[in-house]
């Protein structure tokens, strides 16, 4: 396969380069990644300003390009310009740090995969614990085996897989749902040399989801979580409830009385 790799940690990130080296043993690899860290950029794209792209000689086994854009930009340019739309799969990662629960809203890594799904190719976001001695080689071989054996045709269009690795040895993988995992934010006021006040944000993880099939629960038990996510944010159940209100007698009465 021709696989496009990106990330949000930057083009020299260990997780990205090790994954690229492992996958290059069986696949054609194109790396297009931000020249510097783009963590927590979400699904931002660059408009009304240039996106610079340059080939870098980080590794010689396959082409690697650094851009001034976001992960979503990298996927767009990689697929539509550098690869002339000849890409079979997009993989974003391996990210340094998990992307669980509501992390996916903020994650540049996840958004890189969702951009691939939006462009119509099988796409994966891959994240790992943020620790120095994490075994990226083992994780990369897991991903290599996974993409060879998983039937991506079973997924609905515009769906990506969000994959997270556990801290220790891998017991296997489990299909999971996105958890209710939020942050209790803290803001520390600081002063710059000119006397201006700025803020430094911290966040304490709040994991209050009791379901055993949620992503962080599975990861905490030593399994790889595989969560299907979509580019669409529609709440189907709420839409049905809203339609009931729209078609209800009370709504029609209120509308007529206000006309």
Curated annotation (Swiss-Prot):
GO terms assigned for molecular function: 3'-nucleotidase activity; 5'-nucleotidase activity; exopolyphosphatase activity; metal ion binding; nucleotide binding
Metal-binding is among the record's keywords: yes
Binding residues for a divalent metal cation: 8-9, 39, 95
Enzyme class per UniProt: hydrolase
EC number: 3.1.3.5
A Pfam entry, by short name: SurE
Gene3D superfamilies to which the protein is assigned, alphabetical: Survival protein SurE-like phosphatase/nucleotidase (3.40.1210.10)
Keywords: Cytoplasm, Hydrolase, Metal-binding, Nucleotide-binding
Predominant subcellular localization, coarse grouping: cytoplasm
Superkingdom field: Bacteria
Keyword Nucleotide-binding assigned: yes
GO CC terms in record: cytoplasm
Catalytic activity: a ribonucleoside 5'-phosphate + H2O = a ribonucleoside + phosphate
Cofactor(s), by name: a divalent metal cation
InterPro entries found in the cross-reference section: SurE, SurE-like_Pase/nucleotidase, SurE-like_sf
Subcellular location: Cytoplasm
Cofactor stoichiometry and binding remark: Binds 1 divalent metal cation per subunit.
Family the entry assigns: Belongs to the SurE nucleotidase family.
Its job: Nucleotidase that shows phosphatase activity on nucleoside 5'-monophosphates.
NCBIfam families for this protein: PRK00346.1-4, PRK13935.1, surE
Protein name: 5'-nucleotidase SurE
Organism: Pseudothermotoga lettingae (strain ATCC BAA-301 / DSM 14385 / NBRC 107922 / TMO)
